Amino acid sequence: MDQELMRIGVSLPDNLLDRFDNIIEKRGYSSRSEGIRDAIRNYIMHYEWMNEVEGERIGVITLIYDHDQRGLVNNLTDIQHEYMGMIKSSVHVHLDHDNCLELIMLQGEGKQVKEVAEKMMALKGVKHVKLTTVSPNTEL
């Protein structure tokens, strides 16, 4: 598959680039570009998978965030209050001096479950968000 390649520039913090380079080496990529292309493909697949949330869904949002980020805790709380009818439970864990982990279990229309995760994802100071969903009607 011969596709024209486009050159882009990316600015990253040193520690993130170091971790990425370590993964590149361990996975045997021939270059950073190969690793970045693979990471972008995975990101696109994850995004497309997240958009397949039709109907009733049970979800878990996993967040890691900097609790010292000004206004972040209040913004996260406001989002949770906005969707209080969907949120069944949440667990808060202090990971270290700067970082907290939050698990939020919710149930509702898939598009709204995704909306909650996306609102949290957009907040400054949120370092990681992962949404996992299942259908409550899944036959085993």
UniProtKB/Swiss-Prot annotation:
Binds 1 nickel ion per subunit. InterPro entries: Acetolactate_synth/TF_NikR_C (IPR027271), ACT-like_dom_sf (IPR045865), Arc_rbn_hlx_hlx (IPR013321), CopG (IPR002145), CopG/NikR_regulator (IPR050192), Ni_resp_reg_NikR (IPR022988), Ribbon_hlx_hlx (IPR010985), TF_NikR_Ni-bd_C (IPR014864). Ni(2+) binds at H81, H92, H94, C100. One of its GO terms (molecular function) is nickel cation binding. Its cofactor is Ni(2+). One of its GO terms (biological process) is response to nickel cation. SUPFAM superfamilies: ACT-like (SSF55021), Ribbon-helix-helix (SSF47598). Keywords: DNA-binding, Metal-binding, Nickel, Transcription, Transcription regulation. Pfam families: NikR_C, RHH_1. Belongs to the transcriptional regulatory CopG/NikR family. HAMAP family: NikR. Transcriptional regulator. This is Putative nickel-responsive regulator. It comes from Methanocella arvoryzae (strain DSM 22066 / NBRC 105507 / MRE50).
